[in-house]
């Protein structure tokens, strides 16, 4: 158990847990999208044309979207710009790239990850100040390299997946997972999330050894905290002027892995230079990591314990482009560097781990399904033949 290679593997499992679990299931702060207020009431503009809408059961239904009359006006009497969600059906594509270097027992370990998740968001109904939405994971792509050992998975191209991929079943379990999110339309706080039990069950079936850990880090509170940043990048008062700033804070308790506190400072910067129809919001993020509060707490099935940590975030920046006409975040980009040390205990032996990590995330919205659904076929498709 004390062999250096085993220890490095265990540490990697812990550090990989957050990116996998926080699939942005609901889009973390970095997955937050910029949002714009409708310029005027125009159902034809805001509603994806029928011919462009994706087909199949995964297609969000426009009839479920909140009515146009609920959208706030473009500007108030003071000339401020009003930002508000319209809660119409839309899709998200979220890509996160992580470069990580660790030094464990004088051994250098590098890890590179590129993760892409495809989501659909479908408004189901409104109940007073509440709106209920369904979020579905439509596709998952992973490209991971740990110390020169590649792991790849692509749910959109099953034939390209390696049957010997040790994490293939785990990645597959993420695909097609569905959640029901109840959101306060005024505060953008997530009041309730349904689908947690079924989601955890799927992941446990794919890897039963992870059950204790998943039960701890995928609590309902944790899922709510991960969901809120998708919507609450705009101020609750709605109307802003250039230079206006506002703050948000979230805490993500990952049990035996530790606690992550994010402090976000947003600043409205006016119309985007490249596209005047989008409003630009700058983001400054401060990420603070705290080790598990109780040293005696169960390790959640992990073969090690995190006893202490000194991690500092640097160069954190981001931009949100909000589409007021469609009432949603059109695009967001964020990046952050994390550096420091972790004190890990395994088998009664304390070891120091030096960590250096750079992460960037881009999230884009669309009216059409970014994942092409192909009919089942026993024969592999001819790449030269156009899809029908």
Predicted regions and their residues:
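N-terminal export/membrane-targeting signals
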Residues: 1-29
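Signature of exported/secreted
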Residues: 32-36, 41-388
């Amino acid at each position: 158990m004390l062999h250096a290679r085993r220890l490095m593997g265990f540490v990697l499992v812990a550090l990989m847990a957050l990116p996998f679990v926080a699939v942005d299931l609901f889009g973390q702060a970095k997955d937050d999208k910029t949002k714009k207020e409708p310029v005027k009431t125009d159902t034809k503009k805001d509603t994806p044309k029928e011919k462009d809408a994706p087909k199949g059961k995964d297609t969000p239904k426009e009839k479920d979207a909140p009515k146009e009359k609920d959208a706030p006006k473009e500007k108030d009497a003071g000339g401020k710009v009003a930002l508000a969600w319209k809660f119409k059906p839309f899709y998200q594509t979220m890509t996160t790239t992580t470069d990580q270097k660790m030094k464990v027992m004088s051994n250098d370990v590098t890890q590179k990850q590129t993760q892409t998740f495809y989501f659909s968001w479908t408004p189901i109904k409104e109940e007073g100040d509440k709106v209920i939405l369904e979020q579905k994971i439509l596709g998952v792509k992973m490209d991971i390299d740990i110390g020169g050992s590649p792991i790849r998975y692509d749910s959109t191209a099953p034939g390209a997946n390696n049957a010997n991929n040790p994490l293939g079943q785990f990645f597959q379990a993420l695909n097609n997972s569905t959640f029901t999110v109840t959101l306060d339309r005024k505060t953008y706080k997530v009041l309730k999330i349904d689908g947690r039990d079924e989601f955890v069950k799927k992941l446990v079936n794919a890897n039963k050894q992870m059950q204790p850990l998943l039960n701890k880090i995928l609590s309902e509170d944790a899922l709510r905290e991960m969901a809120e940043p998708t919507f609450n990048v705009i101020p609750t008062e709605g109307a802003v002027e250039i230079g206006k700033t506002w703050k948000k804070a979230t805490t993500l308790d990952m049990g035996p892995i530790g606690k992550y506190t994010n402090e976000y400072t947003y600043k409205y910067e006016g119309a985007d230079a490249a596209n005047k129809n989008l409003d630009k919001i700058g983001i400054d993020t401060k990420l603070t990591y705290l080790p598990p509060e109780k040293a005696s707490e169960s390790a959640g099935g992990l073969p090690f314990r995190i006893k202490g940590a000194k991690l500092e975030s640097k160069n954190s920046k981001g931009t949100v482009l909000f589409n007021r006409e469609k009432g949603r975040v059109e695009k967001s980009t964020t990046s952050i560097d994390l550096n420091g040390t972790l004190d890990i205990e395994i088998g009664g032996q304390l070891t120091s781990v030096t960590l250096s990590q750079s992460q960037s995330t881009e999230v884009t919205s669309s009216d059409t399904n970014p994942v092409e659904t192909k009919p089942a076929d026993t024969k592999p498709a001819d790449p030269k033949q156009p899809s029908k």
